[in-house]
Amino acid sequence: MIQAILVFNNHGKPRLVRFYQRFPEEIQQQIVRETFHLVLKRDDNICNFLEGGSLIGGSDYKLIYRHYATLYFVFCVDSSESELGILDLIQVFVETLDKCFENVCELDLIFHMDKVHYILQEVVMGGMVLETNMNEIVAQIEAQNRLEKSEGGLSAAPARAVSAVKNINLPEMPRNINIGDLNIKVPNLSQFV
């Protein structure tokens, strides 16, 4: 099972942190820091697997990572996961990010955090691998993007609600609003208009 997914830059700044096991925030920060220091001091030509038992609390935990440009993608897994399978999963995740953001970079992970988390949830949920077919993942992301565009995006909803209320032409301000069993008395708002 995957215990955590960490993405941080060359300076140790976390860009994506996802734990699938509950830890207090201080412990999470310590795990990110120690993982960064373990991974940073390794040469690029050394194996991408290392023991991480003392970090997460068991002797059978491993850190599997890949270094792309300025980012380290680290998966903390237990002994039931295949190291090569997780290495391929990291590749699928990065290539999917690359397809969705057209040449993904560190700034995409910062400014589109919601989309990055959605992509990650298409790949891994609850520490279990859901999907490894990149075309299927991208199809789900595109379907989500179409849905958001058709709804005008959730972030635009409050502005649409305010403009809809402003555009209502009422001959006079209602004093009572009745909705089923609910009766709402409207105060005199003319002094505020």
From Swiss-Prot:
GO terms under biological process: anterograde axonal transport; anterograde synaptic vesicle transport; Golgi to vacuole transport; intracellular protein transport; vesicle-mediated transport
Primary location: Golgi
Pfam families the UniProt entry points to: Clat_adaptor_s
SUPFAM superfamilies linked to this entry: SNARE-like (SSF64356)
CDD domains named in the record: AP3_sigma
Gene3D superfamilies: 3.30.450.60
UniProt entry keywords in alphabetical sequence: Cytoplasmic vesicle, Golgi apparatus, Membrane, Protein transport, Transport
Membrane topology of this protein: Peripheral membrane protein
GO cellular component: AP-3 adaptor complex; axon cytoplasm; cytoplasmic vesicle membrane; Golgi apparatus; intracellular membrane-bounded organelle
Localization in the cell: Golgi apparatus; Cytoplasmic vesicle membrane
Subunit description: Adaptor protein complex 3 (AP-3) is a heterotetramer composed of two large adaptins (delta-type subunit AP3D1 and beta-type subunit AP3B1 or AP3B2), a medium adaptin (mu-type subunit AP3M1 or AP3M2) and a small adaptin (sigma-type subunit APS1 or AP3S2). Interacts with AGAP1. AP-3 associates with the BLOC-1 complex.
UniProt record similarity statement: Belongs to the adaptor complexes small subunit family.
Function field: Part of the AP-3 complex, an adaptor-related complex which is not clathrin-associated. The complex is associated with the Golgi region as well as more peripheral structures. It facilitates the budding of vesicles from the Golgi membrane and may be directly involved in trafficking to lysosomes. In concert with the BLOC-1 complex, AP-3 is required to target cargos into vesicles assembled at cell bodies for delivery into neurites and nerve terminals.
Name used for this protein in its record: AP-3 complex subunit sigma-2
Protein source organism: Bos taurus
Gene name for this UniProt entry: AP3S2
